């Protein structure tokens, strides 16, 4: 009898442990779906408050299933208002008085470190933006012998050699030699686009230099993009940028990187750089590269040249979304996955709808129209393949051209984030069998309570589709988490249901 009582007491203790110590919801489960957020848009105010905004938002992000954020370039640019892509001093994270300011557009180094600490406390990873193609805002000019090249064919020289004054000397008067004593001179670069002595904008290649050849072959050779182009054939440069990468990761306790403008940077160096930082930090350092080309073959070539050691943004999928949103219902929705990275290399695809370059007024403007954005987010957030990214500008709205600003769509994206966090698990079944209405289902996973879903999107008229969600879900009543449809769906004994969607809309059905 005493033994039975002791056994009962132990079982009771174990039961309480299970109740209070195990995760209370799917959100805390070990297999929580990963969701990345790009936490900025191009026209963020130059108020120095962005790192504080990020810190204050950390609880909200965690609640809605965001597991990682990509922060904007954290280092000093050409001015305080620089978005960060005119990189001046990679070691100044808002700490030194340079370019007329201590803080960057986003705030100070200390504020950023506090924000990252807050994110980490909520199990949100932080990916730093890496801008290492060029340097802008040099401290002084240098006399350099150079030739002009044809902008349409960078391999074709169109002038004789002559002297120019190039902005290529970086000595960082505010920082000095803190963190690094490396000073940049003309011979650390391949070329530039400005001759200060003649006030001429041309593409100049420096004497004795050659464009890096492991780059995109657009314009003959697309090594040169802007400012002073970094020469990765120079061993001192390669060593310094590797050293900086390790410092950057350790100084901010980063968990990964977003690599900017990789089609202009020597591919083998990027491969080696990622491997080097991973080795030195002892961390996985998830890395995604921005290779901007609507061409699966070009992206596959990059993945191959970098030994598939990091991911790429699925640019072709973005352009499919853009096309679908602009063709007035004439787009064939069955083709959404055609020639996309996620269809060929799902483990290397970061899927997205829009970003700071595609938003209105920007260099790669190809904005997905507002009505289609919820459909696109349902597509990337509730399917099994790809690592989806949510854009700050879609959640909170964008600024810039007041006639073309993106409105805040948080109220429409939140239910889709909830669907990803709590329901988008298990085997997937696709129904890409109609020009307008396409759908997919997830059967759910026994380790995530009440999981499973059925999603429909259409760029044309509304309608219905009979879809299979698994016999294990028979008898359940499902409802549309987006609120777009009000009628419930009862799953039949064979695991099938008939799901409806409104015209030009999305519906995601989950267990009530």
From Swiss-Prot:
Gene Ontology CC: extracellular region
Swapping residue 219 to F leads to an effect described as:
Great increase in thermostability. Great increase in thermostability
Task: Provide the top EC class.
Answer: hydrolase
Provide the effect of residue 365 to H.
Loss of activity
Q: Which cofactor does it need?
A: Ca(2+); Na(+)
- Record annotation: effect of changing residue 150 to X: Decrease in thermostability
One of the entry's Gene Ontology molecular-function terms is: alpha-amylase activity
User: Pfam families under this entry?
Assistant: Alpha-amy_C_pro, Alpha-amylase
Impact reported for residue 64 to X: No effect on thermostability
Query: What does the annotation give as the result of altering residue 162 to P?
Result: Great decrease in thermostability
Look up what happens after changing residue 219 to L: Increase in thermostability
Q: How does activity depend on pH?
A: Active up to pH 11.
Per its UniProt record, what InterPro entries does this chain match? A-amylase_thermo, Alpha-amylase_C_pro, Glyco_hydro_13_cat_dom, Glyco_hydro_b, Glycoside_hydrolase_SF
Summarize the impact of residue 155 to X.
Decrease in thermostability
User: Subunit details for this protein?
Assistant: Monomer.
Instruction: Give the protein's recorded name.
Output: Alpha-amylase
Instruction: Name its species.
Output: Bacillus licheniformis
Q: Which gene encodes it?
A: amyS
């Amino acid at each position: 009898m005493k033994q039975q009582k002791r056994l009962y007491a132990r079982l009771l203790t174990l039961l309480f442990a299970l109740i209070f110590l195990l995760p209370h919801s799917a959100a805390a489960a070990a297999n929580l779906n990963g969701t990345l957020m790009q936490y900025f848009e191009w026209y963020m105010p130059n108020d120095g408050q962005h790192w504080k905004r990020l810190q204050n938002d950390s609880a909200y992000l965690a609640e809605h299933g965001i597991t990682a954020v990509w922060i904007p370039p954290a280092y000093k640019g050409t001015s305080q208002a620089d978005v960060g892509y005119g990189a001046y001093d990679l070691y100044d994270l808002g700490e030194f008085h340079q370019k007329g300011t201590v803080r960057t557009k986003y705030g100070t180094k200390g504020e950023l470190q506090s924000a990252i600490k807050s994110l980490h406390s909520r199990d949100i990873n932080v990916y730093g933006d890496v801008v290492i193609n060029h340097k802008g805002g040099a401290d002084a000019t240098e006399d350099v012998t150079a030739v002009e090249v044809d902008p349409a064919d960078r391999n074709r020289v169109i002038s004789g050699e002559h002297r120019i004054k190039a902005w290529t000397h970086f000595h960082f008067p505010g920082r000095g030699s803190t963190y690094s004593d490396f000073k940049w001179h003309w011979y650390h670069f391949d070329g530039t686009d400005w001759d200060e002595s003649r006030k001429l904008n041309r593409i100049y290649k420096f004497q004795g230099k050659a464009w890096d050849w492991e780059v995109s072959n657009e314009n003959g050779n697309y090594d040169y993009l802007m400012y002073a182009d970094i020469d990765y054939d120079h061993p001192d440069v390669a060593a310094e940028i590797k050293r900086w990468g390790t410092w950057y990761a350790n100084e901010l306790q980063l968990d990964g990187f977003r690599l900017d403008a990789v089609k202009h940077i020597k591919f083998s160096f990027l491969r080696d750089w990622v491997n080097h930082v991973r080795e030195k930090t002892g961390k996985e350092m998830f890395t995604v590269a921005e290779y901007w080309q609507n061409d699966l073959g070009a992206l596959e070539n990059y993945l191959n040249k970098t030994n598939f050691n990091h991911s790429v943004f699925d640019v072709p999928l973005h352009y499919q979304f853009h096309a679908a949103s602009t063709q007035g219902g004439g787009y064939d929705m069955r083709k959404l996955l055609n020639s996309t990275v996620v269809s060929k290399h799902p483990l290397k695809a970061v899927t997205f709808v829009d970003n700071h370059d595609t938003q209105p007024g920007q260099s790669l403007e190809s904005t997905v129209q507002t009505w289609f954005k919820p459909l696109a987010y349902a597509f990337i957030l509730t399917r099994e393949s790809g690592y989806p990214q949510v854009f700050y500008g879609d959640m909170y709205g964008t600024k810039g051209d007041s006639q073309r600003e993106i409105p805040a769509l948080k109220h429409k994206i939140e239910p889709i984030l909830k669907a990803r966090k709590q329901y988008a698990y298990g085997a997937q079944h696709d129904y890409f069998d109609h020009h307008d209405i396409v759908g997919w289902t997830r059967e759910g996973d026994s380790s995530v309570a009440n999981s499973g879903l059925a999603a429909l999107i259409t760029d044309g008229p509304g309608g219905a589709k009979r879809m299979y969600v698994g016999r294990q879900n028979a008898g359940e009543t499902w409802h549309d988490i987006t609120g777009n449809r009000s009628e419930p769906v009862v799953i039949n004994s064979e695991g099938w249901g008939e799901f409806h969607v409104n015209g030009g809309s999305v519906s995601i059905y989950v267990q009530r």
